Amino acid sequence: MSGVRAVRISIESACEKQVQEVGLDGTETYLQPLSMSQNLARLAQRIDFSQGSGSEEEEAAGAEGDAQDWAGAGSSADQDDEEGLVKFQPSLWPWDSVRNNLRSALTEMCVLYDVLSIVRDKKFMTLDPVSQDALPPKQNPQTLQLISKKKSLAGAAQILLKGAERLTKSVTENQENKLQRDFNSELLRLRQHWKLRKVGDKILGDLSYRSAGSLFPHHGTFEVIKNTDIDLDKKIPEDYCPLDVQIPSDLEGSAYIRVSIQKQAPDIGDLGTVNLFKRPLPKSKPGSPHWQTKLEAAQNVLLCKEIFAQLSREAVQIKSQIPHIVVKNQIISQPFPSLQLSISLCHSSNDKKSPKSATEKQSPEDHLYVLEHNLHLLIREFHKQTLSSIMMPHPASAPFGHKRMRLSGPQAFDKNEINSIQSSEGLLEKIIKQAKHIFLRSRTAATIDSLASRIEDPQIQAHWSNINDVYESSVKVLITSQGYEQICKSIQLQLNIGVEQIRVVHRDGRVITLSHEGQELQDFLLSQMSQHQVHAVQQLAKVMGWQVLSFSNHVGLGPVESIGNASAITVASPNGDYAISVRNGPESGSKIMVQFPRNQCKDLPKSDVLQDSKWNHLRGPFKEVQWNKMEGRNFVYKMELLMSALSPCLL
């Protein structure tokens, strides 16, 4: 067996976990391994802080070694054996280094505490700088303390003064920087609002709306220059700016589009250059640079010129029954007969002569700001259409191009259908339609207001809708009598005001179309007010218990009305003794007749045919009532008094 070569066998435990117990059936119960925190707590429990540090033990061991060096050789051999055992002996306390560091830190903290207590409490020790010169023998220690305090206060005061000087310098420098803004910072602010590019040694900007879809040929270029008109050695004004812009001469000043509607058209020979500039020049906003206001005004002038150029081009191209007239900076159109629409470009430059000419030719302000605002909206919509004319292909694999080109194929449109799809109204046509609608709406409102102020009975009320369109508005017209609003609700009209006509919708759904003439609307409203009186008598008769014998909105008897037709109604009392006949016309007015019983008529001649007394209960002829002498605030109130007087007493 001794000659057999040794074989190394690695023995490993079958289970790393310790076995707690083994059951009768052979099952083993294991102990769960300790977690990191539990293992750390177990090791900390083994530390004995009562023992000395390792450094002290080493020093003691070193002293013993020195003592043993003086001993014999036998003792030195034993010592080497013991040192060998110590070298291979593992450390029993793994946290010895932590304990040593904590003890050294505690020692240093104690020393620091002692030093601070000595410095704070002068009873222990006084710290003074070392002086080279010997102190005089008669100098008092209190004098030295006073001198040291003065020196320390002087040093602190010097530090505070230096800090105050630095703060004042920084504040003054910031104020000077605000006043003396450099060219580069202003150029950076300018680039944040406007498009700039460098061409050679010049910096050019763009005022046009080409990026928004404008096709106006004006270049709209301005140049950025450095302001050198001020002497920097002198006092700099507050509004000084080192940057200035130079715009084209035709874009200087301010401009706006003046749109007005006049009833009488002047002679064509009197038309000329319109100079009706009344608006003040735009003022710069507080905090904004002057070049911003200057560029905004120039861009507004460019936009107004583009609008007027587009309108002039369309005025020449559009074929209408009454041709449009373009004279210098004015466009004349006639939307309705005896009505003139004037669109003028008013441009005021910064010359001194322009205010004088403006004051000489001032006229009453009839400018329609709504149409001017709509012109700006329309030109922006035109720009948007120009940008979106090239649409993305659907599907994505199709080539780029216009939509009508992609629709060609088996289901392609013919030429007429494509023209109908592509046909769109121009800027001038849209603004003329809006002007027609505005004029028709104002004429309708004036007609209703004039009737309401002129006629007190019946009352006419107009409720305008807040939600309108640029081409259509609606107003609800109510005709009522004062004090009888609950029973007199028969006349309710809805007026839909369009571009060239007015649609009237009655309460029962009937629709009547009126033209743009104001007299036609006035006649219609007068006839409706006349019918209202008859309808009010009908509703009052139902409330009073009278019987309606006849009713007609269009009476064919009597005088012919020049406006509409007359209405009539006949009602009888509850017992049938009395009858009231009412005839009301838009022009002739109201006529009321009362029929009495025969036995109350003294003027009737005796008849030889009607001898029986029963015929006396029949009603006699009608007698007209002097309506002007009746008491009452309105027509319905007078009619109520008349019916009450003729009704039988039930007591």
Swiss-Prot record:
This protein's record includes keyword Nucleus: yes
Q: Which Pfam families match?
A: Med17
Q: Where in the cell is it found?
A: Nucleus
> Which terms are listed as keywords in the entry?
Activator, Nucleus, Transcription, Transcription regulation
Report the GO terms under cellular component.
Answer: core mediator complex; mediator complex
Bias (Low complexity) ranges: 62-74
* Keyword check for Transcription regulation: yes
Which biological process, per GO, is one annotated for this protein?
positive regulation of transcription initiation by RNA polymerase II
Which Gene Ontology terms cover its molecular function? nuclear thyroid hormone receptor binding; transcription coactivator activity; transcription coregulator activity
Matching entries from InterPro entries are given as: Mediator_Med17
Return the annotated region ranges for Disordered: 51-83
Summarize the subunit comment: Component of the Mediator complex, which is composed of MED1, MED4, MED6, MED7, MED8, MED9, MED10, MED11, MED12, MED13, MED13L, MED14, MED15, MED16, MED17, MED18, MED19, MED20, MED21, MED22, MED23, MED24, MED25, MED26, MED27, MED29, MED30, MED31, CCNC, CDK8 and CDC2L6/CDK11. The MED12, MED13, CCNC and CDK8 subunits form a distinct module termed the CDK8 module. Mediator containing the CDK8 module is less active than Mediator lacking this module in supporting transcriptional activation.
Function in brief: Component of the Mediator complex, a coactivator involved in the regulated transcription of nearly all RNA polymerase II-dependent genes. Mediator functions as a bridge to convey information from gene-specific regulatory proteins to the basal RNA polymerase II transcription machinery. Mediator is recruited to promoters by direct interactions with regulatory proteins and serves as a scaffold for the assembly of a functional preinitiation complex with RNA polymerase II and the general transcription factors.
Q: Which PANTHER family match?
A: MEDIATOR OF RNA POLYMERASE II TRANSCRIPTION SUBUNIT 17
Family per UniProt?
Answer: Belongs to the Mediator complex subunit 17 family.
**What is the protein name stated in its UniProt record?**
Mediator of RNA polymerase II transcription subunit 17
Q: Which gene encodes it?
A: MED17
